[in-house]
Amino acid sequence: MSLSPEKATELKQIIHEQLTRMDVHGKIRAVLAETLKDEFKTDSQHLSEEDLMMALRQRGVIEDVVNELRFNEEHISRNFTSTPKPATHFIDTEQRTLKKTNIDPMRRYLHLQILGGKAFLEHLQEPEPLPGQACSTFTICLHFRNQRFRSKPVPCACEPDFQDGFLLEVHKDNLGDGSRMADATTMLSICDPVQLILIKLDTTGETTLVASHFLEWRSVLESETGTTSLAVELLGVGAECKVSVGVLNVKLELYPPLSKILSQEIVKTQLSIERQKTAEKERLFLVYAKQWWREYLQIRPSHNTRLVKIFAQDENWINRPVCSYVRPLRSGRLLDTPRQAARFVSVLGFEKAPVVGGGGKQEQWCTLLAFLCRNKGDCEDHCNLLCSLLLGFGLDAYVCVGTKGKGVAHTWVMTYGTDGTVTFWESLNGHRYLHKPINPDAPPMVEQPKCEYPYRLIGCIFNHQCFLANCQPSDSVELCVFDLNDESRWKPMSEEAIKSVCSPGSTTSLPPFPPLCSSVVDAATESNDLELQLRFLVSEYRKDLGLTTVWEDHLSYLLTPALASYEIERTTGICAGNEEFQDSIRRAVPNGHTFKGFPIHFVHRNARRAFATCLRSPFCDEILSCRGDQIRLAVRVRVFTYPESACAVWIMFACKYRSVL
């Protein structure tokens, strides 16, 4: 078998990883030491290569290595450079592509290994999955200092078989000698934790946030061996934040090892000082917030009923200032425009925080990593992300807290233009609305602007630097004047007070913001797979009705421009290409025939769920159960990918038939 240089390198790396896992070097050293001691003690001190090989053969080391490295035909024929298709329902048994990593010899690295789990008691009775059988899986997502990793999915079990390692670069960006290798003292001053998110994926493709944990890694600085092992207990989220989910076996190791370690007392003292400083800053901010709130109520007693939200609970039920949930976030080359950012946020799934028992809405503002890894969240999560992205694009953006129709609590995003233009952004669908206030004192003959937005009341607005409470006589959005510099209309909080607890690095309890990740979804492959599944479902549906199904591939292909046009319109607000689509359909449908089409949009890739939703539409059902002469059916699926593997899925069902009436 001849291999290209690239594939040969990949193969060498796989063999190297296998040898490392088997600890072959350690075995060779042990054999060498034993051979030198026992067999060559009285002979000459020269040990030849043949002597060593004979000793290795006698002890079975070489045979073990050969057996471990024996590749079957499937492994030989596999293309090592292709990226395996990520599993959605089934366990991914394929060997992952080994990515080449440029390791800077002048940098320090933290090797974090997750070596299994235990006491995941919710899955105590979980049966062992059969090969190829669909089962629920666990995945661990990790973030540390702008570096993100994701573990291989493993079957849910009482003792899940996590076997993953992550190489984390440890350095200080803001130091003048940032190119130098970080020593123990420098690393001790790096207070960023390693955030671990545990996600469960069930057999229907639904994701659940199981646990969110912040790992303090600096205990490795006091280890004489440069390694330390930890039993990390994961707690639940929301109402279950005090309940243990399970325990992860974690091993930390520094590369290269420290030449000088720190004493346990120094590390303990540093962590204690950081906690004390954080607690003091948070205490002072709470004292200030209480005083500010008393002043706000003195303006007008009715302010007590307004939605002025200063603090919000995260997934671990920790109270944080709302300003800490927003920060300018640049998407690199993943998103090009603010409107594209709004479209991306809108295709992330919407799901309210689960409530145990009855009662009102469960409050849970997720940290950004938890929201992105789960790929869905409540409207507050969407708004915080959208506001952060708009700030990253240089806009003056704020999150608005208020209500929409029927008094339902809601949040949305507002941008304030340099010319005073106020634009509302709905994070759940990407819609934009211009705000023009109504003047209640205007004469009856004066035409007032019509409000197209669904928002009714507004209590406060905030971003990473500002918090402003609405103190106008009415908190109605349509009457609101957004002159943010007028303190008679908007009562501000001290920017210094906000900065003391919300700016990056101000407190050790503040979760760092992760970068966005590019999509790993192959749009063409996913589109084709969904289309084939829908064809099968339609054929079976018509078969149950006693109808035959004839597909026309050309008609299906002609539906593509329409789906592309719909997505462009959602992103830019501009409708383009409709004339060409209509002209092509007219040419494809003969005289005397009728054409019907039904487009629909989803943010998931579950064919059965999508098909069940489509059948609830009478118009779609009319197409799928169409009876007539010379019936030809068509279906087209177009998957549009966005960062974080979010997808906008457009489906169009169509039919053409000869009219007999």
Residue ranges of model-derived segments:
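Acidic, S/T/P/G-rich intrinsically disordered/coiled linkers that flank
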Residues: 1-139, 143, 147-149, 190-192, ...
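Eukaryotic intrinsically disordered and solvent-exposed regulatory patches
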Residues: 95-100, 123-128, 150-155, 167-171, ...
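Eukaryotic beta-sheet cores, primarily in C2 and C2-like/PH beta-sandwich modules
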Residues: 112, 137-142, 163-217
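Intrinsically disordered, low-complexity regions enriched in proline, serine, glycine
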Residues: 121-126, 150-154, 177-180, 205-209, ...
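C2-type phospholipid-binding modules
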Residues: 124, 189-263
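Short proline/glycine- and polar residue-rich coil/turn motifs
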Residues: 155-162
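His-Asp-centered catalytic microenvironments across diverse enzyme cores
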Residues: 229-238, 246-255, 264-298, 373-374, ...
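Secondary-structure boundary elements
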Residues: 286-378
